[in-house]
Amino acid sequence: LGLYAPFVMQHALALARTFNADLYVVHAVEPMGLFAESVLQSYLDEQALNEFHSQGLKTVIANIEQRVLDSFREELGDDGEQDLQRIRAVRVLQGDPSQVILDQVHKLSVDLLIVGSHSHGVGAETPLGRTAARVLQLAKVPVYLVPLMERRRREDR
């Protein structure tokens, strides 16, 4: 997840506590690029490559989901068990991030979508990241946008 995920999660948990709501954590990863695919093809035979795509990717994604949950558990500490119970699922899905998020909004029938304005600090000078902008444009549910912390600190000066 992005650098600001814990900050976004704090907002999500505060809202969930206030409204006694459940949380679904969705993280989208871009599909494997051509370079990575060609490297795998160089070292794996066709059967091993097919097995990697079917099982290896599932294993990698399951490990990412577990690490995300573990990082939230660590972030919340011993007092956060009740907050952790609010998290119904952590889903890591491959695809275009904005489309993955919008698809999950529909599949999970969510009432409110909470997103960070940027996933990491690289685009800190732009007012809104690509994924956040696209989600804001296309979402059919209200979107709660959490601003980048660095931007807020700079503007406070």
Where are these regions (language model features)?
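Structural beta-alpha unit
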Residues: 4, 18, 66, 70-113, ...
